Amino acid sequence: MSDTDYLTRAEAVLAAVERSVDAANDGDADVDLERNGSVLTLTFENGSKIIVNLQPPMKEVWIAAKAGGFHYRFVDGAWRDTRSGDEFFAALTGFATQQAGMPIAFSA
């Protein structure tokens, strides 16, 4: 994947996360979202955080959550965990739901 393709796809991930947080906040969720360059920080009511950031040199998107640190690469049309193969948005949904104590869904 070229650098341009990576940036286009990775920025789309960040935009989708932002849209998903907005949708969750339209419901019962209370998630604070802060963007600083290519880093998104999601802060939940209980003070826990999830950080999503881009890693251009490695062409990856990373998640840091209570469950640990996870690296995702674009493979066969989806961002996949480099160890487990889990899809990015499904994994982020699980991490956020666990940390928020309520269902919070993320999608592309």
From Swiss-Prot:
The keyword Glycoprotein does not apply. It comes from the Bacteria. The keyword Nucleus does not apply. SMART domains: Frataxin_Cyay (SM01219). Keywords: Iron, Metal-binding. Signal peptide: none annotated. One of its GO terms (molecular function) is ferric iron binding. GO terms for biological process: iron-sulfur cluster assembly. GO terms for cellular component: cytosol. NCBIfam families: FeS_CyaY (TIGR03421). Belongs to the frataxin family. Involved in iron-sulfur (Fe-S) cluster assembly. May act as a regulator of Fe-S biogenesis. This is Iron-sulfur cluster assembly protein CyaY. The lineage of its organism: Bacteria, Pseudomonadati, Pseudomonadota, Betaproteobacteria, Burkholderiales.
